[in-house]
From Swiss-Prot:
Mutation effect (S135A): Substantial decrease in phosphorylation
Cellular component GO terms, alphabetical: centriole; cytoplasm
Chain ranges passing through the membrane: none
Complexes and interactors: Interacts (via N-terminus) with centriolar protein CEP250/CNAP1; the interaction results in recruitment of CCDC102B to the proximal ends of centrioles. Interacts (via N-terminus) with CROCC/rootletin and LRRC45. Interacts (via N-terminus) with serine/threonine-protein kinase NEK2; the interaction results in phosphorylation of CCDC102B.
Function per UniProt: During interphase, forms fibers at the proximal ends of centrioles to maintain centrosome cohesion. During mitosis, dissociates from the centrosome following phosphorylation to allow centrosome separation. Contributes to CROCC/rootletin filament formation.
Entry keyword set: Coiled coil, Cytoplasm, Cytoskeleton, Phosphoprotein
Species assigned in the record: Homo sapiens
Coiled coil: 72-142, 268-337, 363-513
Compartments it resides in: Cytoplasm, Cytoskeleton, Microtubule organizing center, Centrosome, Centriole
Gene name tied to this protein: CCDC102B
Effect of S404A: Substantial decrease in phosphorylation
Protein name, entry field: Coiled-coil domain-containing protein 102B
Region (Disordered): 493-513
Modified residue annotations for Phosphoserine: S21, S22, S34, S135, S142, S194, S210, S401, S404, S406
Post-translational modification: Phosphorylated directly or indirectly by NEK2 during mitosis which causes dissociation of CCDC102B from the centrosome and allows for centrosome separation.
Length: 513
């Protein structure tokens, strides 16, 4: 309950007390103004005045009861509106949390997708480099069969006696071929270290290495061809070479054979290293292919799940917008209903005022009717007395007529007939007044019943007013407590301000020192 509602209750209680005081003063004013009654009907008018005052009091109390009920309805509606507003705030907070969670989730998904794309791009570059290296290795795989053919020919020539002179002639060519193989090995080592550079440098290095290898393989192959041609020419000059080889010393043959054996061992080592490098590169390519397939699968999954997540987000956003529209519509409807209720309350107030005015007019009419009734009762008594007197006179005249019949008797008969006619008219008027009297009595009984009902409602209203007074006292106590707390806080705030000012002054003095 707010301070405004507390002030409203205070004003309502003050108005109610003023109404009660006005009702009491009105009752005190009405009591002495009542006219004197007869001894036979003294109780009835007093009861009518009491019922009139009680009716006025009940009407005012009924008005206050209606006002309290309207206020209670307003308070309940306010509480309902506050509860709905709190619920709407909770839903808004929940939706904001949901949207924040979705944004965080989508930011993570986007970051993962971008990282996956970057890794896929790097893997593609690595795969291209590996494919280029494989192409160069495949080109180099054509060298081992040629080397094996050279080794076979060398072994055959070593067994022949004319090999010494032939070897002397082709040692230079063999040295050239060995130098070419060493240069190939150096290029392979350089290529192996060059894979650690950037992607653009890798592509350029691979192209340059392949060109250099192709250029250097040509003289190597030329040397092999020369060696083969020299070997084929051995068949023609074997006889002359054998004769020359006999004359050469055996020491030169042993040194050359050892040198050739060393070269063969080196070539075998180079081939073994190249095979190991090839197997390692094949394993690396397989691993890269498997990783690439895995990343492709992950990328496809992310690509497939993206529209689903977007649809879910759109659905949730649509639901949120629908709920917001419903809440705004509910708020508008509540405002419209509140306006309509205010209009109904105003109409009811106007109707209540009209009924109060009608009630006062009816009470005035009732007082007038009671006065007329009392006058008619007096007239009825007077007429009854006159009838009795006339009956006595009639009896006397009948006796006189029985004794003597004269013109006076005829005149008395005529007067008697006129009096009888007047008596009939008076009886007819008496019956009419009696009917009106019965109707007024029925109205009075109905009014008394209404007064009893209003008295019960007044008791209820008094209990309600007492409860409201107790609640008002409690709220006033709470208000006083809150005001005391506010004053205490204000005092503590003032003390803190004074302390801060003192500290600032001390700090300024210290700074000045």
């Amino acid at each position: 309950m707010n301070l405004d509602s507390i002030h409203r209750l205070i004003e309502e209680t003050q108005i109610f007390q003023m109404q009660q005081s006005s009702i009491k003063s009105r009752g005190d004013m009405v009591a002495p103004a009542s006219p004197p009654r007869d001894t036979c009907n003294t109780c009835f008018p007093l009861h009518g005045l009491q019922s009139h005052a009680a009716h006025n009091f009940c009407a005012h109390s009924y008005n206050t009861n209606k006002w309290d009920i309207c206020e209670e309805l307003r308070l309940r509606e306010l509480e309902e509106v506050k509860a709905r507003a709190a619920q709407m705030e909770k839903t808004m907070r929940w939706w904001s949390d949901c949207t924040a969670n979705w944004r965080e989730k989508w930011s993570k998904v986007r970051a993962e997708r971008n990282s996956a794309r970057e890794e896929g791009r790097q893997l593609r570059i690595k795969l291209e480099m590996a494919m280029k290296e494989l192409s160069t290795l495949k080109k180099k795989q054509s060298l081992p069969p040629q080397k094996e053919a050279l080794e076979a020919k060398v072994t055959q020539d070593l067994k022949l006696p004319g090999f010494v002179e032939e070897s002397c002639e082709h040692t230079d060519q063999f040295q050239l071929s060995s130098q070419m193989h060493e240069s190939i090995r150096e290029y392979l080592v350089k290529r192996q270290f060059s894979t650690k550079e950037d992607t653009n440098n890798k592509e350029q290095g691979v192209v340059i290495d392949s060109l250099k290898l192709s250029e250097e393989m040509k003289p190597n192959l030329d040397g092999v061809d020369l060696f083969n041609n020299g070997g084929s020419g051995n068949g023609e000059t074997k006889t002359g070479l054998r004769l020359k080889a006999i004359n050469l010393p055996l020491e030169n043959e042993v040194t050359e054979i050892s040198a050739l054996q060393v070269h063969l061992d080196e070539f075998q080592k180079i081939l073994w290293k190249e095979r190991e490098m090839r197997t390692a590169l094949e394993k690396e390519i397989e691993r890269l292919e498997s990783a690439l397939s895995l990343w492709k699968w992950k990328y496809e999954e992310l690509k497939e799940s993206k529209p689903k997540n977007v649809k879910e987000f759109d659905i949730l956003l649509g639901q949120h917008n629908d709920e917001m529209q419903e809440l705004s519509g509910n708020i508008k409807e509540e405002s419209k209903s509140q306006n309509s209720k205010d209009r109904v309350i105003c109409e009811l107030r106007a109707e209540l005022e009209r009924l109060q005015a009608e009630n006062t007019s009816e009470w005035d009419k009732r007082e007038i009717l009671e006065r007329e009734k009392q006058g008619l009762e007096r007239e009825n008594r007077r007429l009854k007395i006159q009838v009795k007197e006339m009956e006595e006179l009639l009896d006397k005249k009948n006796r006189l007529s029985a004794n003597s019949q004269s013109p006076d008797f005829k005149m008395s008969q005529i007067d008697l007939q006129e009096k009888n006619q007047e008596l009939l008219n008076l009886q007819h008027a008496y019956y009419k007044l009696n009917r009106q009297y019965q109707a007024n009595i029925a109205e009075l009984t109905h009014a008394n019943n209404r007064v009893d009902q209003n008295e019960a409602e007044v008791k209820k209203l008094r209990l309600r007013v007492e409860e409201l007074k107790q609640g008002l006292n409690q709220k006033e106590d709470e208000l006083d407590d809150s005001l005391n707390q506010i004053r205490k806080l204000q005092r503590s705030l003032d003390e803190e301000k004074e302390r801060n000012e003192n500290l600032e002054t001390e700090l300024r003095h210290l700074q000045n020192w």
